[in-house]
């Protein structure tokens, strides 16, 4: 699994743990809903700025987004 797919799966997992829909998270983070959906499917290469917005919206440290991600 690519790093982008692992990261997307991790974001989806954290979003679901907060019981947020993609729409909820996109509004809270200020990130386009379609972009966020693509990100969760591993189709985007997000910047640190975008990842930080998502982490803040999920109320987690940025490093939490990378937990469990294995380098290929």
Regions found by a protein language model. Give the residues of each.
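Short basic helix-loop element that most often maps to the first helix and adjoining turn
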Residues: 9-28
